[in-house]
Amino acid sequence: DIEDFYTSETCPYKNDSQLAWDTCSGGTGNCGTVCCGQCFSFPVSQSCAGMADSNDCPNA
């Protein structure tokens, strides 16, 4: 279940069917809600655009 897979304490997801970004709970980075499913310490929304899953995401 995608909702379960991308849910975490440090990086809440938005229930979107497209690539969408939300602020991390720490307030210092961006969350990849569909692409990365995890938080980064730098903005990655541009880097993640068009990526399908966490295997394609840049390292934090």
From Swiss-Prot:
GO terms for molecular function: pheromone activity. Its main location: secreted. The keyword Secreted applies. Keywords: Disulfide bond, Pheromone, Secreted. Disulfide bonds join C11-C39, C24-C35, C31-C57, C36-C48. Transmembrane segments: none annotated. It is found in: Secreted. It comes from the Eukaryota. One of its GO terms (cellular component) is extracellular region. Mating ciliate pheromones (or gamones) are diffusible extracellular communication signals that distinguish different intraspecific classes of cells commonly referred to as 'mating types'. They prepare the latter for conjugation by changing their cell surface properties. This is Mating pheromone En-2. The lineage of its organism: Eukaryota, Sar, Alveolata, Ciliophora, Intramacronucleata.
